[in-house]
């Protein structure tokens, strides 16, 4: 039964903000249990809302989910609680901001053993910008290693709440969950009653169903949506019929009407999930709203990588798999490309490194496609001498040096939260990665928040792994894109016997090009198998070779059959062998094994 007019004041829309592993999905399970949306014996798996295998395995939430719960408070009133689950990872911050826009309140969940982490702060700022009521919650208070008082001080310093406003819970054991439910009802504001206004509904997520097409999850901000209405999407001006609308409580419940304040879903035979864009506004054709809801933007991919099938005859399988994946993931962008070394494949754009890993893992796991990935890189802006601007996301597309005026690369602002004893290590890593140090804030006596600005190209690679290893796993990071800046960048080519291998070329800063070239040549020397002739591995910038390694030839002893005898006989055989090797070198192609392309990814090891 959808809420009627009198019940708009009984609706509470809220989300949970937390760093990875701070217990967000477990807390959501407890809320479902307390409200009897699900009984504990029905929970075949923990983390009910994380329904992808990958989400459960990595312990992260990738897609936003929504679930409606009914709760009878201690004041005897029946409330409708809409929990909108948000992805917690930096790559998905736009999805987070749209999920937050669908809420009036947020639970800020902090692990009692870990304290405030970087992504908690980043998402908290998004929530404050969205004007949400924030309820701080300390989770995992039952663990022996928990420091509840210390974490409470961090939260007070961060958002300036009173100590008694901070709730203490253990999501796993259900301690304090009843108090939390009462706090949600008491502190989260009810939605505004805008039913008289023209319809405006915010899409905060969309999923693809093989039978129904794209299903949009929506929050009705203004007006009323009825089943059978003709609706228009602002982003692409397309018109659809609302075939089915309803609310979500782990499964879809069809209703006839959704009013301002409600959260639900909309099915209208949309063939492509790209037509139901996250952040878009839906209005009625008959009585349209004058303008869309604020905050919509087209999400641009930040990291690019080539995906190639291991077996060249699997190209069509890869195409089909990418098509199916992109139905569910509107932020995945891909175009076909060819490489002389790897054959046919796709150039894919991702929101960030985690997004890239997830796509690769899902391709291999859900679709059984074995793929090779090239070095991830970012999109550079090349200002030509003619004055035009070219965007380059693949080193092999870089124009000739003589035609380039200058090159710009994307920068990000990053905050790193860590224990104070690791500051030195992190500063060193920051300087190695061309970071600009900004400032340091102390969160408490032992934890600091360090601000840097980095070129995105230095961060997309293995920065997160390095950060974790130098801080023994204690550092967490979060970054946001701040724009393009001019840099002294060069294209580094790898030549095998004078032939460039396009899949191994990369764009690096001039100051690092010699070291990178040398390391790459040494790495390849250990991977490329020996041939019957000498192989020269060279790293070059333009026509200038800056590093070289040689793989010596395998040699057959042609003198074995000459026991004694004349030196000229031996010389003749050696000359003949030399001649043959020279001819082989001219016609032979060096086979580059697949490990060589992966070597670039772990060049420092």
From Swiss-Prot:
Molecular function GO terms recorded: GTP binding; GTPase activity; ribosome binding; translation elongation factor activity
Main EC class the enzyme belongs to: hydrolase
Cellular component aspect of the GO annotation: plasma membrane
GO biological process: positive regulation of translation
PANTHER family hit by this protein: TRANSLATION FACTOR GUF1 HOMOLOG, CHLOROPLASTIC, TRANSLATION FACTOR GUF1-RELATED
NCBIfam families, per the entry: lepA, small_GTP
Record's protein name: Elongation factor 4
């Amino acid at each position: 039964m959808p809420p009627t007019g009198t019940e708009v004041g009984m609706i509470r829309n809220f989300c949970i903000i937390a760093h990875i592993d701070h217990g967000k999905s477990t807390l959501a399970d407890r809320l479902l249990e307390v409200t009897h949306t699900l009984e504990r014996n029905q929970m075949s798996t923990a983390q009910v809302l994380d329904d992808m295998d990958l989400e459960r395995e990595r312990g992260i939430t990738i897609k936003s989910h929504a679930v409606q719960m009914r709760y009878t408070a201690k004041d005897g009133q029946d409330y409708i609680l809409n929990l909108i689950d948000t992805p917690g990872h930096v790559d998905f911050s736009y999805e987070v901001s749209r999920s937050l826009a669908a809420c009036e309140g947020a639970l800020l969940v902090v692990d009692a053993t870990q304290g405030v982490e970087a992504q908690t702060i980043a998402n908290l700022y998004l929530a404050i910008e969205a004007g949400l009521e924030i309820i701080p919650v300390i989770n995992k208070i039952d663990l022996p290693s928990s420091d509840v008082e210390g974490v409470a001080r961090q939260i007070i310093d961060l958002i300036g709440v009173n100590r008694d406003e901070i709730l203490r819970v253990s999501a796993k054991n259900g301690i304090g969950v009843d108090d939390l439910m009462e706090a949600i009802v008491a502190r989260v504001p009810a939605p505004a009653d805008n039913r008289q206004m023209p319809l405006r509904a915010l899409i905060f997520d969309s999923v693809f169903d093989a039978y129904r097409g794209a299903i949009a999850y929506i929050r009705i901000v203004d007006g009323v949506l009825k089943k059978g209405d003709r609706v228009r999407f602002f982003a692409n001006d397309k018109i659809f019929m609302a075939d089915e609308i309803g609310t979500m409580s782990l499964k879809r419940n069809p209703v006839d009407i959704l009013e301002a304040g409600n959260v639900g879903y909309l099915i209208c035979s949309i063939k492509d999930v790209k037509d139901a864009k996250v952040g878009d506004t839906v209005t009625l054709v008959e009585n349209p709203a004058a303008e869309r809801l604020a905050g919509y933007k087209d999400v641009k991919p930040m990291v690019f990588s080539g995906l190639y099938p291991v077996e060249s005859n699997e190209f069509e399988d890869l195409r089909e798999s990418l098509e199916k994946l992109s139905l569910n993931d509107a932020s995945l962008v891909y175009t076909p490309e060819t490489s002389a070394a790897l054959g046919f494949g796709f150039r894919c754009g991702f929101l960030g490194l985690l997004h890239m890993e997830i796509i690769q893992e899902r391709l291999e796991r859900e679709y059984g496609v074995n793929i090779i990935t090239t070095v991830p890189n970012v999109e550079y802006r090349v200002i030509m001498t003619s004055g035009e601007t070219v965007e380059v996301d693949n080193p092999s597309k870089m124009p000739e040096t003589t035609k380039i005026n200058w090159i710009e690369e994307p920068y990000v602002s990053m905050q790193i939260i860590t224990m104070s004893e690791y500051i030195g290590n992190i500063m060193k890593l920051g300087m190695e990665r061309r970071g600009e140090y900004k400032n340091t804030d102390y969160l408490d006596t032992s934890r600091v928040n360090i601000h840097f600005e980095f070129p995105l190209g230095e961060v997309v690679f293995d920065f997160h792994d390095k950060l974790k290893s130098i801080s023994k796993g204690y550092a967490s990071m979060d970054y946001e894109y701040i724009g393009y800046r001019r840099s002294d960048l060069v294209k580094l080519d790898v030549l095998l016997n004078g032939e460039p291998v396009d899949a191994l070329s990369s764009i690096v800063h001039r100051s690092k090009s010699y070291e990178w070239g040398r390391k790459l040549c040494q790495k390849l020397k250990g991977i490329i198998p020996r041939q019957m002739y000498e192989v020269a591995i060279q790293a070059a910038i333009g026509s200038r070779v800056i590093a070289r390694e040689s793989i010596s030839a395998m040699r057959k002893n042609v003198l074995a059959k000459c026991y004694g005898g004349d030196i000229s006989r031996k010389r003749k055989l050696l000359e003949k062998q030399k001649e043959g090797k020279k001819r082989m070198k001219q016609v032979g192609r060096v086979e580059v094994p697949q490990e060589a392309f992966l070597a670039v990814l772990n060049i420092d090891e």
